[in-house]
Swiss-Prot record:
Catalytic activity: 7-phospho-2-dehydro-3-deoxy-D-arabino-heptonate = 3-dehydroquinate + phosphate
Pfam family, one: DHQ_synthase
One annotated Gene Ontology cellular component of this protein: cytoplasm
Family: Belongs to the sugar phosphate cyclases superfamily. Dehydroquinate synthase family.
Organism phylogeny: Bacteria, Pseudomonadati, Pseudomonadota, Alphaproteobacteria, Hyphomicrobiales
Protein name, UniProt field: 3-dehydroquinate synthase
EC number of this enzyme: 4.2.3.4
Source species, domain of life: Bacteria
Length: 376
């Protein structure tokens, strides 16, 4: 890990994707600078700001004021908060409002919110007028380190999570770390699961750094900025190597195959399970399943579980409130996973901490047996 920078600094992570290249700015005070940063990069002078009922009272006024100061006229679209907003109904509401605001191709849609708002707004930006400019202003840790970067957008289906969507890269990401101070402890912990994921994929030194410094990351300041920047750089590196998820980008789904199945099983009820919590449980399950398949040591799974438990994240299916459906139902959700190819199951498994890999054609019989063991 690099030395921790001063708390007042803003870090920039560049995502070099040719004509779709963009910057991720990370640090305090970026919402106040949003108008100037957008105006310096985009030609259009109109914006539709998509946000939710929780975020709007906190940050919408400040963002609109910043846009006004930069000469960018804006209209706001305020949607309900929560995972269930990722639906066709709310997507069409957003699209209609963007069109009502007469946003043209050189203008932009701005996502002001967490992963739900970012995913839905990006989908709207990708399909309105066959594509308008898009800016992410993520307000959750999970969105800052994961969903705002990389161009994946989408909504959920009754068949599973994120199954309907497009790739539409943002033109700019403004990760204002000040906004994280208003997150609940549960929301911050959920985002931290995605931070830990990058260490578990291929950066064992980063995972070890997190084990030693997680309390400082939770406290805020320089360690938090460093963790977010390292996470964004890790994701940017993978996205540049495989923008359309035809190969190594699938590694970013570590923990997500099991996690998405659990989210589907709980009907996206955030009172029971939020995305980062599903990823936390999923990462432990992925390491345990790898050990079961004699790919990794059980000690690695125990180490992952120990750290995630230490920060207060759920690590077992039994940690989810309420009853879960049987293993066979979970298996049905896994079979709908986006990584399935020609009906064959694909998982992100591991040979050790920071040694994740794409495992094709995983035997369904092994998975169902494992699920029955973990959820009898």
């Amino acid at each position: 890990m690099n030395a921790i920078p001063s708390a007042s600094s803003v870090q920039t992570v560049h995502v070099p994707l040719g004509e779709r290249a963009y910057d991720i700015l990370i640090g305090p005070g970026l919402i106040a600078r949003a108008g100037a940063e957008i105006a310096s990069r985009l030609k259009g002078r109109k914006a539709a700001v998509v946000t939710d009922e929780n975020v709007a009272p906190l940050y919408l006024q400040a963002l609109v004021a910043s846009l006004d100061e930069a000469g960018i006229a804006s209209a706001a679209v305020v949607l309900p908060a929560g995972e269930k907003t990722k639906s066709f109904e709310h997507l069409m509401t957003a699209c209609d409002k963007v069109l009502e605001a007469r946003v043209e191709r050189n203008d932009c849609v701005i996502a002001l919110g967490g992963g739900v708002i970012g995913d839905l707004s990006g989908f709207a930006a990708g399909i309105v007028r066959r594509g308008v400019r898009f800016v992410q202003v993520p307000t959750s840790l999970l969105a800052q380190v994961d969903s705002s970067v990389g161009g994946k957008t989408g909504i959920n289906s009754r068949h599973g999570k994120n199954l309907i969507g497009v790739f539409h890269q943002p033109d700019l990401v403004l990760a204002d770390t000040d906004v994280l101070n208003t997150l609940s402890e549960r929301e911050f912990r959920a985002g931290y699961a995605e931070v830990a994921k990058y260490g578990l994929i291929d950066k064992p030194d980063f995972f070890a750094w997190l084990e030693a410094n997680w309390k400082a990351v939770f406290t805020g300041g320089a360690a938090r900025i460093e963790a977010i920047a390292a996470s964004c750089q890790a994701k940017a590196d993978v996205v540049v190597a495989d923008e359309r998820e035809n190969g190594p980008r699938a590694l970013l789904n570590l923990g997500h195959t099991f996690g998405h199945a659990l989210e589907t099983a709980t009907a996206y009820d955030s009172s029971r399970l939020v995305h980062g919590e599903g990823v936390s449980i999923g990462m432990v399950l992925a390491h345990e399943f790898s050990a079961r398949m004699n790919l990794a040591s059980p000690d690695d799974a125990r180490r992952v579980e120990r750290h995630l438990q230490e920060v207060g994240l759920p690590t077992r299916m039994s940690d989810i409130p309420g009853a879960l459906p049987p293993a066979e139902t979970l298996m049905d959700a896994i079979a709908q996973d986006k990584k399935v190819k020609s009906g064959k199951l694909t998982f992100i498994l591991t040979r050790g901490i920071g040694q994740s890999f794409v495992a094709d054609d995983v035997p369904a019989s092994e998975v169902i047996s494992f699920l029955r063991e973990k959820h009898p």
